[in-house]
């Protein structure tokens, strides 16, 4: 069981790092070249994308953290 949890933690850490890089690469900073309705639509689309990616990052981070807590519990009960 401990080996499976450690493998899961490692895999989640890899996925988290990839998602954090994707967040930086996919979601550009606010742009000033749009005006009016186009600017509003662009900003809304970016906000939606950022929220979606941030939710994914948070979910994977929470899973990794819960896995770390499970590892600690297994280790404490084994000793």
Regions found by a protein language model. Name each.
Residues 1-79:
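N-terminal secretion-targeting helices of virulence/extracellular proteins
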